């Protein structure tokens, strides 16, 4: 998809991923009979959603209705909600977008490097995603999305309770994980 509704960049003085246009995409407009994309993606059991528009890389923890569903940093197993990745860092004449000083709880990994994504879908239960630096080939991000056979993600009628974790600790534990 093109325009993300979760990200942590700043456009001017505010993040344009939290503005009115993004909310309209995310939750829809009941008066116009337009459903929000977030409910549709969640109800259909989507595992991952890739976005562009912003000129950087950012991977989110699984998130729904601004509620973060933490997983380990490099493995999302049986995630209840989609994981979102903004991957618009191939480069452009306007240079990179700037990150907000505040890092929202749903933000797992951010990079301003020019780069590209390599995605391997092995079967119905295993997907491996790597983000690489275009200039030197360095690994920027490494994620496995796995699920048990027959598992169907999706938060049904209420948002489940999430818990806060120390993302720095997760990063140390999972940085070298190559599953």
Show where each model-derived region lies.
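Metal-dependent phosphoesterase/phosphodiesterase active-site architecture
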Residues: 1-50, 54-179
């Amino acid at each position: 998809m093109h325009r993300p509704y979760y990200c942590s960049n700043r456009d001017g003085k505010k993040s344009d991923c939290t503005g009115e246009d993004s909310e309209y995409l995310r939750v829809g407009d009941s008066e116009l009979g337009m459903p929000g994309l977030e409910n549709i993606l969640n109800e259909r059991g989507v595992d991952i959603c890739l976005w562009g528009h912003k000129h950087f890389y950012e991977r989110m923890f699984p998130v729904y209705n601004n509620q973060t569903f933490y997983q380990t940093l490099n493995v999302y197993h049986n995630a209840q909600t989609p994981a979102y990745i903004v991957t618009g860092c191939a480069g452009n004449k306007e240079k990179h977008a700037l990150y907000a000083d505040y890092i929202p709880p749903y933000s797992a990994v951010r990079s301003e490097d020019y780069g590209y994504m390599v995605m391997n879908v092995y079967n119905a239960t295993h997907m491996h995603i790597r983000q690489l630096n275009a200039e030197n080939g360095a690994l920027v991000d490494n994620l496995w999305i796995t699920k048990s056979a027959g598992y169907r993600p999706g938060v049904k009628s209420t948002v489940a309770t999430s818990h806060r974790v120390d993302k720095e600790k997760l990063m140390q534990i999972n940085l070298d994980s190559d599953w």
